[in-house]
Regions:
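Protein-protein interaction/assembly regions in multi-subunit complexes
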Residues: 1-253
Length: 253
């Protein structure tokens, strides 16, 4: 069972009754989705205040639009030498005074965000380089990660009959999603993160009438860095998990 809670640009969250072991396997499989990122940089000029290595590190973390036409370099017919099927070159040629942004990267691969600052160039300072991007996986380096994938249990909040409705728990709720009406708790079940601030506030008041328990459902959150869509991350992660299980089955035979 999957029920969408919210879906917006770059983000999706849903409720599911899958077990935690499966959810964690999908989460980890997201790090095996091939993602395009800058892996090498050759500098011809760099008069900035930053070392080449620092600029190269920043380049690697710039999200690039990952097209489906690219092939992983290990599987490419060029046998790792690098060609148009498995890699793409991006160039920067800038002269100060200016701020060099991700939009200054010119090539056949687009950047997700135009205004990521790379380096500041003062008067007469220059930056000229060629960067090569390739497909990689998050298990190799975090720059190849497609986004943030995490989950938590749905919370169940119970109020005992002897609640005096002092509202101390309501005031303590950091997300302001809790109400106590006629001895019953009203709250957004999918926004409650089981922080138990309400429980602690109740104890400080001399009571112990609120309990927070885990339900048999999970809230799944996916936030994309922009290389691929958030829902694609989930789909590709499940496909990757299936592929891994098939490989495991072959090894066990």
């Amino acid at each position: 069972m999957i029920k969408i809670i919210s879906k917006e640009k770059g983000k999706i969250s849903f409720v599911t009754d899958m077990g935690e072991s499966l959810a964690n396997a999908i989460r980890r499989s997201a790090l095996e989705i091939p993602i395009l990122a800058i892996d090498e940089a050759e500098f011809y000029k760099n008069d900035s205040a930053l070392f080449d290595e620092v600029v190269a590190h920043r380049l690697g973390l710039i999200p690039l639009v990952t097209e489906k036409t690219f092939t992983e370099i290990e599987r490419c017919s060029c046998k790792g030498k690098g060609c148009s099927k498995c890699s793409v070159d991006l160039k920067i040629k800038a002269k100060g005074p200016c701020t060099v942004y991700s939009s200054n990267l010119k090539g056949k691969a687009g950047v997700v965000y135009d205004k990521i600052p790379i380096v500041i160039l003062n008067e007469e300072q220059e930056l000229e380089l060629v960067a090569r991007a390739r497909l990689g996986k998050g298990i190799e380096h975090i720059k190849f990660s497609p986004g943030l994938v995490y989950y938590r249990n749905v919370a169940e909040l119970h109020v005992e009959k002897d609640c005096d409705e002092c509202k101390k728990c309501v005031e303590a709720c950091p997300q302001k999603i809790l109400k106590i009406e006629k001895g019953k708790a009203e709250y957004d079940v999918y926004k409650c993160d089981s922080c138990e601030a309400c429980v602690e506030a109740c104890k400080e008041h001399g009571k112990n009438v609120i309990k927070v328990e885990k339900a048999n459902e999970l809230v799944f959150f996916i936030e994309s860095w922009g290389q691929i869509k958030a829902d694609e991350i989930f789909i590709k992660a499940t496909e990757q998990l299936q592929d891994n299980l098939k490989e495991l089955g072959k090894e066990l035979k």
